[in-house]
């Protein structure tokens, strides 16, 4: 039997009782009609995909006003709507060897590649934040075996799923504001190592541009150059070539990146703009590889409580040096 014959198509017809946005109407009614929870992201994808008609006219605007008495029809491919792309996250449990620094206020760990920093839309998907909480809980219960509530761990910054390296969590809400300020005010200094192909033309350079999202919300998030007048935000990265080599007959370079700002996908976009995309970063023109070869190597900052300078380095994973 052909796959399309197995699709479950549902035609849902709605009438607005009062003025409401299209997105809000569907968020309320679609879960009721399908008898299951539907995330806001899935509702928006339905709209953006052209599955919704407002008074018989296709409507792709989630914010469109639906007047009282207006008719809305939705064609739902149930299987496609609830399909979750299988993830190939690694299985990971935080151990003492993954902890780069810890005191009563903060914990800094070495994040593995191919493991998300925090929880996403799939509730059952493991993540580093959950692993840190489990680690802290297990340690706390060694001295207090009857402890029932897991300890607090605050996310201060994030790394992309495929990026490895240094990441900081707080252990107390009281230091959150001070830690947030370290990153918001660019007091914390970060150094990344990347493997690119081909090598940048210059051994040292700084990339400066205004950045923003350049892909539609219905597609995977992609960032790039966006003029300031169009909402772009300033971003700068200092880049230097550490070494050059060869991989399967193709030239590669090992580069050090020092971001002065913290924009989404900043280093990936800046390296791609030099014609030297990161190995494995297919979204930005890189060659296919087992992972995106980007590693957060060093994080330096004054301690949020003692103000003593701290510099923490995560060892380079295999493949990041000659």
Model-derived features: where do they sit?
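RNA pseudouridine synthases
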Residues: 1-322
């Amino acid at each position: 039997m052909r796959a399309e014959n197995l699709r479950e198509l549902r035609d849902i017809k709605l009438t607005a009782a009062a003025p409401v946005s299209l997105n809000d109407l569907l968020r309320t009614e679609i879960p009721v009609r399908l008898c299951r929870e539907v995330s806001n992201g899935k509702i928006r994808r339905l709209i953006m995909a052209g599955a919704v008609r407002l008074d018989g006219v296709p409507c792709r605007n989630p914010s469109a006003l639906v007047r009282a008495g207006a008719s809305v029809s939705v064609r739902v491919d149930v299987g496609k709507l609830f399909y979750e792309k299988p993830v190939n996250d690694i299985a990971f449990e935080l151990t003492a060897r993954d902890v780069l620094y810890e005191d009563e206020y903060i914990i800094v760990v070495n994040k593995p590649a191919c493991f998300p920093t925090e929880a996403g839309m799939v509730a059952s998907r493991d993540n580093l934040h959950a692993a840190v909480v489990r680690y802290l809980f297990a340690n706390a219960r060694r001295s207090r075996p009857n402890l029932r509530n897991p300890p607090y761990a605050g996310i201060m910054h994030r790394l992309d799923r495929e990026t490895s390296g240094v990441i900081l969590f707080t252990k107390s809400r009281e230091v959150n504001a001070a830690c947030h300020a370290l990153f918001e005010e660019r007091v914390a200094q970060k150094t990344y190592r990347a493997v690119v192909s081909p090598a940048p033309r210059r051994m040292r350079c700084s990339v400066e541009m205004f950045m923003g999202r350049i892909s539609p919300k219905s597609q995977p998030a992609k960032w790039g150059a966006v003029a300031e007048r169009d909402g772009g935000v300033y971003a700068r990265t200092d880049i230097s070539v550490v070494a050059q080599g060869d991989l399967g007959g193709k030239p590669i370079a090992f580069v050090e990146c020092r971001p002065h700002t913290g924009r989404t996908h900043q280093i990936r976009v800046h390296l791609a703009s030099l014609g030297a995309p990161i190995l494995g970063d297919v979204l930005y023109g890189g060659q296919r590889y087992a992972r995106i070869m980007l590693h957060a190597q060093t994080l330096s900052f004054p301690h949020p409580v003692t103000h003593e300078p701290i510099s923490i380095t995560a060892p380079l994973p295999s493949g990041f040096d000659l």
